A protein has these predicted regions:
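Charged, gly/pro-rich active-site loop segments
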Residues: 3-14, 92-163
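Short, basic/aromatic recognition patches
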Residues: 12-35
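Short beta-strand segments
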Residues: 31-70, 78, 84-88, 96-100
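Glycine-rich nucleotide phosphate-binding loop and flanking beta-alpha elements
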Residues: 42, 73, 158-160
Length: 163
């Protein structure tokens, strides 16, 4: 079952539809573990395991899916081709969120992200939205900055599931 963003609660037939909340809830017991799929330059899929959660967009307040990433492959894919799919599961139940990535980080400036302190706090917010906890936030902040971590925000264009 799938739907467009303009109708997040019911389908055309009146059947209940999968929402962003439904999708994220599947991974609540597993610290937001999900598979993110991006497009390589040759059009094939690159998939990897991430922690993802839901939070208000820092500029608009709209509910978005968020994750943190770093490294060459996934970021290069998202910079060139921002389309992605994030799939959550619990047992045999699954839900996929599709949309376009909005990147925010030290190498991906956004007009609403004006300084390193805002990025530091946003990285923490995304981590905790995905169910993460940390015993030493100073260490967490240091590693995020050292690895030049980037926040990926996804405004869902489609959410669908097998249930």
């Amino acid at each position: 079952m799938c739907f467009e963003r303009r109708s997040l609660t019911t389908s055309v037939k009146g059947d209940p539809m999968t929402t962003l909340d439904d999708a994220v809830a599947l991974a609540t017991d597993e610290s937001g573990l999900a598979v993110v799929s991006t497009l390589r330059a040759d059009g094939t899929i690159q998939a990897s395991l991430v922690n993802a959660g839901k939070l208000p967009h820092p500029a608009t307040g709209a509910q978005v899916l968020a994750l943190v990433t770093y490294g060459r492959v996934k970021l290069a894919n998202l910079r060139a081709r921002p389309q992605l799919a994030v799939t959550f599961r619990k047992g045999w139940q699954w839900a996929t969120v599709e949309g376009n990535a909005e990147l925010a980080g030290p190498d991906d400036p956004q007009p609403w992200l004006t300084d390193a302190e805002q990025l530091r706090l946003l990285l923490r917010e995304v981590f905790t939205a995905a169910g993460g906890t940390h015993d030493d936030w100073d260490e967490y902040d240091r590693v995020m900055a050292e690895q030049r971590r980037t926040v990926v925000l996804v405004a869902p264009t489609r959410v669908y599931s097998n249930g």
